[in-house]
Curated annotation (Swiss-Prot):
The lineage of its organism: Archaea, Methanobacteriati, Methanobacteriota, Archaeoglobi, Archaeoglobales. It is an enzyme of class 2 (transferase). It holds the Pfam family CdhC. InterPro entries: ACS_CODH_B_C (IPR045822), CO_DH/Ac-CoA_synth_bsu (IPR004461), CO_DH/Ac-CoA_synth_bsu_3_sf (IPR038571), CO_DH/Ac-CoA_synth_bsu_arc (IPR023432), Prismane-like_sf (IPR011254). This is Acetyl-CoA decarbonylase/synthase complex subunit beta. Its cofactor is [Ni-Fe-S] cluster. [Ni-Fe-S] cluster binds at C212, C215, C301, C303. Part of a complex that catalyzes the reversible cleavage of acetyl-CoA, allowing autotrophic growth from CO(2). The alpha-epsilon complex generates CO from CO(2), while the beta subunit (this protein) combines the CO with CoA and a methyl group to form acetyl-CoA. The methyl group, which is incorporated into acetyl-CoA, is transferred to the beta subunit by a corrinoid iron-sulfur protein (the gamma-delta complex). Residues 437-452 have a biased composition (Acidic residues). Monomer. The ACDS complex is made up of alpha, epsilon, beta, gamma and delta chains with a probable stoichiometry of (alpha(2)epsilon(2))(4)-beta(8)-(gamma(1)delta(1))(8). Residues 453-466 have a biased composition (Low complexity). It catalyses: Co(I)-[corrinoid Fe-S protein] + acetyl-CoA + H(+) = methyl-Co(III)-[corrinoid Fe-S protein] + CO + CoA. Keywords: Acyltransferase, Iron, Iron-sulfur, Metal-binding, Nickel, Transferase.
Amino acid sequence: MVERKRIEIPEGVKVKESVGEEAEFPFDISPMYEGERIRKGDMYVELGGPTQPGFELVMALPMDQVEDMKVTLIGPDLDEMEEGQAYPYAMIYYIAGEMVETDLEPVIERRNHDFQNYIEGYMHLNQRYDIWIRIGKNAIKKGLKSLIQIAKATMMLYKNELPFIEKIEAVYITDKDLVEKLLNELAMPIFEERDARVEALSDEDVDEFYSCTLCQSFAPTNVCIVSPDRPSLCGAITWFDGRAAAKVDPEGPNRAVPKGELLDPIGGEYSGVNEFAKQESGGEYERIKLHSFFEYPHTSCGCFEVIGFYMPEVDGIGWVHRGYAEPAPNGLTFSTMAGQTGGGKQVVGFLGIGIAYFRSKKFIQADGGWYRTVWMPKELKERVAKYIPDDIRDKIATEEDAKTLDELREFLKKVDHPVVKGVVRPVDGKKITNGWVEEEEEEAEEVAEEAAAEAAPAAQPAQAAQPMAMQPMPMQMPGFQLPALQMPAASAAPAGVKLVIKDAKITIEKVIIKKAEKEKKGGK
């Protein structure tokens, strides 16, 4: 177990400290501000996000090691930051109390997203190592001068909303070197440890799953179902975390969900989950399959760590994580696909997941799992490499192998990926796709048979090729019907030969229709 202890502050960095509760704040604090978006033009500064390192972390410590309502700020404060720029950002909370235990750390940590969005002019997105904060210009105009004020407001909300927290202390860091050091040496090992706990447990081993509705302020119809084999989309809540949260706050955002009857063991559909999803989504959804990509997929909020996207050109699924900025082979970036995927929608063809879901033995098992996966960024693939079966690992392309659909198709042919000849899903040995080769062979055989049948009377003297007539279009014009159109004789195919045009797109910019003039007497 990773040791929980207070961080050491290096020499030579700027430090501010403040102890005790704040008398008043220069901003409103209310749930009405949840879901507030701060656009780039309205932003004073950005903290963390796509261009700067950042993380949030909660650690449970003994009572005597936590100084209640103390804030330590390491690095430049708001009044030293340049408007319009982005800065590193880490938020560490030490918590203590009789009921506080290590199992509650991720649950309390996830509520940081909840509480900080109560603050007017402060936007908090994502979680763990993906946090993305924006502070609005209006908040600065109203008197927000220091991140210490944000920390004090957040700690006050923690103690008011979660009274089992008897002591809380915050350390906020904007010094880039220290943020990166603590992210790699402290936060990531703790996150990894939390995720690994649930690997030995399976959906069949428990009687209930847990919900998470924290993101409904941004995605009102999203209902996250957390099972042993499927962690939350944000990656911050596992089944153990949901259980711990429901124990201390049974009416909170993490509630027990009875599994009910197992309706589809491969797709992961349960009657209890369906009933809960229907209720919590306001009737927007009636069915959810936890381990299916195409049929009644899980809804996606906007905090997902990874987006799965279907590419019909190769009949395969790609995955892209939040940290990959380049376009995927389908030509879309993560941020563009996020707009299609998020918002609490059930979208066939796009799916948001947490990185820990790649560990699952049931990873999109209804649709072939890893054997349907054809592309991932190298960074993501390396991160989850040990969970990819040996016989498919080298057949999954990265940006070094393919950046376009044409390049991806060639790569998949070269390595003989299962999608080329047809995917057999491991869970039940069923072949679920035909593959390209089989489809191409069937089409070739069909064309050959038809050509042979039409060539049979070719022993007779060949007739001159006749113009190919197209039937009248089912379109009525005032007073007359569109006449039949004729192709020029030069375009006609020779007798006994069938012309097959595949994958063609025909664009007609203009159709001009004229009445035929009657022949003048005398043949003129």
